[in-house]
Amino acid sequence: MAPKPPPGTSARAWDGVTPALSEWVLDAVASMGFTRMTPVQASAIPLFMAHKDVVVEAVTGSGKTLSFLIPVVEKLLRLEEPLKKHHVGAIIISPTRELASQIYNVLTSLLAFHPPSASTLKPSDDDDDAPRQKFPSSTLKVVPQLLLGGSTTPAEDLSTFLKRSPNLLVSTPGRLLELLSSPHVHCPQSSFEMLVMDEADRLLDLGFKDTLQNILRRLPKQRRTGLFSASVSEAVDQIVRVGLRNPVKVMVKVKGTSGVQDKRTPASLQMTYLTAPPTHKFPAIKHILYSLEPAPQKTIMFVSTCSGVDYLSAILPSIIGDDFQLIPLHGKHQANVREKNFNRFVNSHTPAILLTTDVASRGLDIPSVDVVIQIDPPSDPKTFIHRCGRAGRAGRKGLSVVLLHPGREEDYVSFLEVRKTPVAPYPHTLTITDADAAAATETARKAVLADRALHDRGQKAFVSWFRSYSKHQASSIFRVADLDWEGLGNAWGLLKLPKMPELRNFQGDRTLGVNLDWENYAYKDKQREKRRKEQVQENAENGVADDQAAGKKRSSESVAWSRNLDNRNKKLKRREAKQARQQKDKWEKMTEEERQKVLETEKMLEQIRVKNEEERLLRRAAKDKESKAAGGDDDDEFKGFD
């Protein structure tokens, strides 16, 4: 048994909590390596154990999980008598399968130090034949059950519940509501003690508001409720007003280097940004991964879409190299694939990269993440701190890098600073040449040329990426009009730009300089290639129809330029009118608080835009002055960063 931390007078000593923690809990936290409580634990645990409703807002990686698990377990083990069969004493709700699984794993690690509760846990395969200690039915114990949609059916969950009669449920919202709807599951006021909603704002962001309200209606009002999150939004406040009784609000912040307590991320996390043209992004990522000392063992890279994960997971390994194992993870993966890939990353003993969407940005307690790289800044700025917070957890040093395009996107730095999430320039010298960028593009295209299916995947991913980019909440910073289409296409290793309405007036090279025999460009999958050839043959046999179609196309192309321009202007006006109507409808449906928030955001963005435009003009004037003094103009070559 691990030695308990020595008694002390520190307000964060585990043995100084009032009411006092059980001896076995002190053994458990000591074994887990926690010599003293984190600030959020020191604030929340005594309150929750003292029968207070709590709303806890704290930075990611601050130890929120134990802040609610310990009070819940202590409460269930201090009842006067065991709960009746099929009566539930406590529920923990999580927004995602992965987070629910992690909470359950921490819970079972904790209960392993309480022999009566440990005896109820499902034995591992290695211990199936080992004798298990039995305890009288009158012994108080915690019997947990994990409920996850996609892993088991509701009928199987109910069968397990009836067989084991758990008194603590850890679940995602939908599967929990299904179980609570059964007449065999009981949560009366005489039995039910505590409800925990972890990552509460994410629960609402994912559309679980109605489900949560249905769950709350099935639970007694006389209960203790804990709401834990990295940020508390107006929507969360609505849940607080409905579901909590006179809650105590706990807000734990960390000091920045200036000593001002306004940072929303861990002090041990170094948050940086890197400005690079599209074609330089992937070579820059490779340079970061190979130049850091010590080399990162676990890296998370965020992109904006699921199809982006699917495509980039196929081309990035050839660019980054074999020293890093790249593992994809997104919300559209089958449940078993998500679980398998997540465990591969967590349990990897070699350098690994998790290429993922925002499914991994919240709540997941992935141990020992060294670096977070945001290839795409998140559409919702609130998500930024949650992505960064995957590194630098529990006091561990971490590095976060967000990649930005030169120009207007650099205003994102000021935008983040206003939101109390400051980022600094990437501190290490990094030089990427155009030759490096061209080599990365060539490497990616080589992979795409090997299989037409990868080309199809890339076209879909690029369109999906653009749609996500166009919906960015800070649209005055992330402007579609400023995008370098050819640079983006080359960076992604595309063989041509996809057909999409936004490129209708594009005057550049849609082929991206690639000369390809498309008729003989084949799929690796033989059956798919066979079907493609049959379609090509069918088109050839219907050549007359094709000629007629081509004639119609030529006819449309021969329309007078002025008429085409007039048609385009009419379409543009119709589109603008439609967008204006949609904006008006959206505005009318907003509450007064939501309208005020939108106005404040727009005002803030305009102030940032004006400020940065003034600074940009001053820098340009100074640069022109230096250039003239030197007797020539600077070339456009990318020279890296200091």
Swiss-Prot record:
Question: Which terms in the GO cellular component ontology are assigned?
Answer: 90S preribosome; nucleolus; nucleoplasm; preribosome, large subunit precursor
Q: Which UniProt keywords apply?
A: ATP-binding, Coiled coil, Helicase, Hydrolase, Nucleotide-binding, Nucleus, Ribosome biogenesis, RNA-binding, rRNA processing
Domain Helicase ATP-binding: from-to ranges? 45-250
Compositional bias annotation for Basic and acidic residues:
527-536, 577-628
* SMART domains recorded: DEXDc (SM00487), DUF4217 (SM01178), HELICc (SM00490)
Enzyme Commission number(s) of this protein:
3.6.4.13
Q: Give the catalysed reaction(s), semicolon-separated.
A: ATP + H2O = ADP + phosphate + H(+)
Q: GO terms for molecular function, please?
A: ATP binding; ATP hydrolysis activity; RNA binding; RNA helicase activity
Enzyme class, UniProt record, top EC level: hydrolase
Where in the cell is the protein located? Answer: Nucleus, Nucleolus
Q: Where is this motif: DEAD box?
A: 198-201
Stored InterPro entries:
CTT_SPB4, DEAD/DEAH_box_helicase_dom, Helicase_ATP-bd, Helicase_C-like, P-loop_NTPase, RNA-helicase_DEAD-box_CS, RNA_helicase_DEAD_Q_motif, SPB4-like_CTE
Q: Which PANTHER family match?
A: RNA HELICASE
Provide the domain comment: The Q motif is unique to and characteristic of the DEAD box family of RNA helicases and controls ATP binding and hydrolysis.
The UniProt similarity line reads: Belongs to the DEAD box helicase family. DDX55/SPB4 subfamily.
Query: How is this protein named in the record?
Result: ATP-dependent rRNA helicase spb4
State the species of origin. Aspergillus niger (strain ATCC MYA-4892 / CBS 513.88 / FGSC A1513)
